[in-house]
Regions:
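RNA-binding accessory domains that recognize and position tRNA/RNA substrates
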Residues: 2-181, 185-202, 206-210, 214, ...
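Proline-centered loop/turn at the N-terminus of a beta-strand
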Residues: 113, 181, 252-254, 270, ...
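Active-site-proximal beta-strand elements of phosphoester/diester hydrolases
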Residues: 181-186, 296-297, 337-341
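Cysteine-nucleophile active-site neighborhood
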Residues: 218, 223, 227-303, 348-356
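Catalytic beta-strand/loop cores that center a nucleophilic Ser/Cys/Thr
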Residues: 292-334
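A glycine-centered loop/beta-turn motif at secondary-structure junctions
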Residues: 326-359
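Single conserved hydrophobic/aromatic residue that forms the stacking wall/gate
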Residues: 357-367
Length: 367
């Protein structure tokens, strides 16, 4: 939709009092969330349906969004978990052979409030310099209730994020003629993680976030994967306790994103909130062992403090080339390694997809 199109007004109010005036698309109303930005050029439908964005208002830095539409095949979860959506310009005439609708209709169906025709470059600079902050998108006159909204914004906090996105039921995927059985913890996992494991000959048992060591023993998997997910990792105290016990079962473990953070917390390390996070499909990561840099897809606002890990327990295997933060951990006395980025990257770079070929079974560690 042209940025000059005259449609219903919408407003973005930030915690620092900054107001952006734009136009409404998607649902109408008022929504509060943590305002973040992603630098991905494509994959907006995957962004909108990634549970890791729970409670957040997502800004797309790329200026034109929606030109290939939306379709049923690119969902990363059953629904959208973002609180709100911000773009510079959206396309109302998408063209793609897989297209089944446009992004405005998608947002309306998902009841997501969006705003377009604002200066997303200016907004991104504010977040980059001041850090992520809470904000509100509203289709009402923001100036008439600015003080009331600012109070609500400052009181807003994302809580119980993992509990809000995990499925309480255990589900099984993959063929009966599988080579391995993998227990995938659902902290807010993306479907493509599951699909990549199935494509590699695994039967995938998706288990709830609060699954215990005893329950894992009953499943008897060849490997365990801790998935991505939303929120502050340190608030998941019961999950962290379970992970500590699960790690002692001797079953190979691989963690991604939030799973990487929870595994580190379970083994004595700490996490920190990043100023504006790593969100996008162009994050450079250095593999310390190889001395090579890989381009990765990421979506996280917290990071493991690498130096907080006891060197007798684990060592940092990957670091972010931009800010030097921990991007991977390899454990010494347990059969486990974890990464902060997404090797499955759908859509995004496939530089680190080889990590998914590492066998979940100790019988064949070179696959």
């Amino acid at each position: 939709m042209s940025i000059f199109n005259q449609s219903q007004k919408a407003y973005l109010l930030l915690a620092d009092g900054t107001v952006f005036e734009g136009c409404s698309f998607g649902a109408e109303g008022t929504v509060i969330g943590e305002v973040v930005f992603t630098t991905s050029l494509t994959g907006y439908q995957e962004t909108l349906t990634d549970p890791s964005y729970y409670g957040q208002i997502v800004t797309q830095t790329f200026p034109l969004i929606g030109n290939y539409g939306v379709n049923d095949g690119d969902y990363e979860s059953a629904r959208s978990y973002v609180s709100g959506y911000i773009v510079r310009e959206w396309c109302n005439t998408p063209s793609n052979f897989r297209c089944q609708g446009n992004i405005d209709t998608f947002l309306k169906e998902q009841n997501i409030i969006g705003i377009h025709s604002i200066d997303t470059r200016c907004l991104t600079r504010i977040i980059r310099e001041a850090g992520v902050m809470n904000g509100v998108i509203t289709t009402e006159n923001v100036y008439e209730k600015k003080d009331e909204l600012l109070k609500q914004i400052n009181e807003y906090k994302i809580t119980d994020a993992v509990k809000s996105v995990t499925n309480p039921e255990t589900r099984t995927y993959g063929s009966e003629n599988h080579k391995y059985k993998v227990a995938l913890f659902d902290f807010g996992y993306k479907r493509n993680i599951r699909n990549e494991l199935v494509n590699r000959g695994c039967e995938v048992i998706v288990v709830p976030a609060d699954t215990t060591a005893e329950q894992i023993k009953e499943i008897a998997p060849d490997g365990i994967m801790f998935s991505n997910g939303p929120g502050d990792p340190s608030e998941n105290t019961e999950v962290i306790k379970n992970i500590r016990e699960i790690a002692q079962l001797g079953i190979p473990i691989f963690g991604i994103c939030l799973g990487h953070q929870l595994m580190a917390l379970a083994h004595g390390a700490t996490t920190q909130k990043l100023k504006y996070g790593h969100r996008g499909a162009n994050q450079p990561v250095i593999d310390k062992a190889l001395g090579k840099t890989f381009v990765t897809s990421q979506n996280h606002g917290y990071a493991v403090v690498g130096e907080s890990m006891d060197p007798e327990i684990g060592e940092v295997s990957h670091i972010n080339a931009n800010d030097g933060t921990c991007e991977g951990m390899r454990y010494k006395n347990i059969n486990a390694f974890t990464v902060q980025f997404h090797p499955e990257a759908h859509g995004g770079p496939q530089d680190t997809a080889c990590l998914l070929y590492t066998s979940p079974s100790p019988r064949d560690r070179t696959r």
